[in-house]
Amino acid sequence: MKDGEWIITGEKHFISQASVSDYCVLFAATGEEETSKGIKKRISAFLVDFSDPGVEVAEGYRNVSHRGYTNNILRFNGARIPEWRMMGPEGDGFRLVNEWLGPTRLTVAATCVARAERAFDIALKYASEREQFGQKIGKFQGVSFPLADMATEIKMANLMLLESAWKIDQGSVTAEDCAMVKLYCSEMLSRIADQALQTVGGMGLMEELPLERIW
């Protein structure tokens, strides 16, 4: 720290929507302390204004999927952050990030459920319209049984998500709850997207259908 300002230097990639934002919460090492497990860095949280001197929002990468938002690179070139912008006491950043992490994981889970529902809808519509051997392909058990499994998995994931969201409202959610929901929903999406692609076939890899964005 110098003259009442913290001097931040470093770089962070894959920052969602930074190009359309004015602020971010930054977690940075502000010192070290001796613990029973050895030297540990003190992590503190700051509210950063992207117009602060030394803060640069650079162009990031083009996503294979998730094209509805940008990801950017944040560069801190000796950025000067006023001391009053520290969120909580020095060294409180790790506690804060753990406090926020659970609800944030649920937003990821909710996105996965929504994308899985979209993939299922595309596959179901295709199976209801595409004809082979004189009937809709959805009439074949090799297609209809996987569709039933997909619907069941999505239902299970959504119920897990709703339960944890309810627990947040009640103040009883745990880190384990949120971690399990995110794990199940994200892996569920992978399975649903793959099965939807199998249902649609080669057309699923074409941009004319949005499945390739999900897969």
Please state what every model-predicted region is.
Residues 20-21, 41, 69-71, 101, ...:
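Short, solvent-exposed loop/turn segments at the edges of secondary structure
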Residues 53-80:
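Flexible, small-/acidic-enriched active-site or ligand-binding loops
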Residues 4-5, 9-56:
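A short core secondary-structure module
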Residues 5-6, 73-75, 89-94, 98-215:
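Alpha-helical interface subdomain recognition
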Residues 36-38, 57-59, 83-90:
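Short, charged, solvent-exposed linker or helix-capping segments at domain edges/interfaces
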Residues 1-7, 66-68:
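Short, ordered beta-strand-loop transition motifs
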Residues 13-19, 65-66, 103-107:
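Glycine-rich phosphate/pyrophosphate-binding beta-alpha loops
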